[in-house]
Amino acid sequence: MGLVKNLSIGILGTGFMVLATAAQAKAMTLNYDRSIGSPGFGPGQLFVPQGITVDNQGNTYVANGRGVNPDGTPNYNLGDNIEKFSPSGQYIGAIGSGGTGPGQFDEPTTVDFNPVTGDLYAGDVHNNRVNQFDSKGNFIRSFANGDFTGLIPGRFFFGPSGVTFDKTGNVYVGDFNGERILKFTPDGKQIGVIGGKVGTALGETKGVAGVRISPVSGNIFLADQYNNRIQVLDPNGKPLYTFGSTGSGPGQLLQPIGIEVDDQENVYVADSINSRVQVFDKNGKFLTSYGKPALDASGKPVPPPGLTDPPFGNPLDLTPGKFNWTGGTSYKNGKLYVGDFFQGRVQVLNVEGRTQVPEPSSILGLALLGFGAATVTLRKRGQQKPVFSLDKELQKQC
């Protein structure tokens, strides 16, 4: 539990000064609320849910997986759309379809609404572009055609990754293998580039996955996937600091993908291979985590599917809080939406304890200051492209 002290000083009458320090902490917890979608290939069913977003009416939008035939060729009749669900989780319909034409997808990934314009933006991996729709799902345009770096040796991810927006509505899109973030106007004109160097130093990356701009500071938080860390940049793209390290302990990461930042700058990270979501404060202090690996009948973790297998774990473990890798994330109105990568669903979590919690105080001492007295009071309290089953190969990249 993080400890934050605030110091206040006030003059009471003539010569009296009161000093008060208030220690404040965040006792945050994540609790299961419900699931959206089910594993499968029909309407309202999901496979490899990547991008997730929620509109102002509480409807949930999920970027569904890429349909593939047994020989590896695209099957545009499966997935390749954005599934829409009501606030209660009922299937409403789909935006887009499989293909290469206007408004079509060949593997949608990141998806989010522009808070200024209300338009919906979605990454389109194999078509190498971003598709833009209005708030009702009507296609507007595609942009960034061919701007994203393709597949490179040793990696299983490529294309547009996270999408996020600044307070003026400009669009920032991660280029996973380009190790950079591309900046566009709301109508898709490129106006800037952030990053672009591969490596482990501050400001360098190994796979730009999720990207999110803080609604408070405007800082940019990005999931640096193969470096197993989060990088924080200022609004101009200047690197500030990183947090997280390789591993499975509290605050450690194995290939983080999705990332969210709420209105108090709590940072939610989909810690994919660890099959959980972790929460940090804006400085990278670990607060809490939620989720455990899906288990088979013998109690062993269920591995991700093989390259030629259906995109689901075998067996499925749909117990609340069990994941077969975590993927996309979205935060809205006290709830966190987390993609259950290889179990074809989105788990919705209640986020509790985001505010600072006061605790009982005790007077520790009284001292004379000049002609007055000072009372000291201390309150103390005492938290893209799918990955397959090649676990060892992937972890070599960590």
Residues covered by each model-derived region:
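Blade-level signature of beta-propeller repeat domains, shared across WD40, Kelch, NHL, RCC1
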Residues: K322-T355
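A short loop-to-beta-strand structural motif that recurs across blades of beta-propeller domains
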Residues: D80-E83, N128-N131, E179-L182, N228-V232, ...
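Short loop/turn segments immediately following the C-termini of beta-strands
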Residues: G65-G67, V125-H126, F176, Q225, ...
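A short, hydrophobic C-terminal helix/tail in secreted or cell-surface proteins
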Residues: E359-T377
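A detector of repeated loop/turn-to-beta-strand junctions in beta-rich toroidal repeat architectures
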Residues: L46, Y76-G79, F105-D106, N127, ...
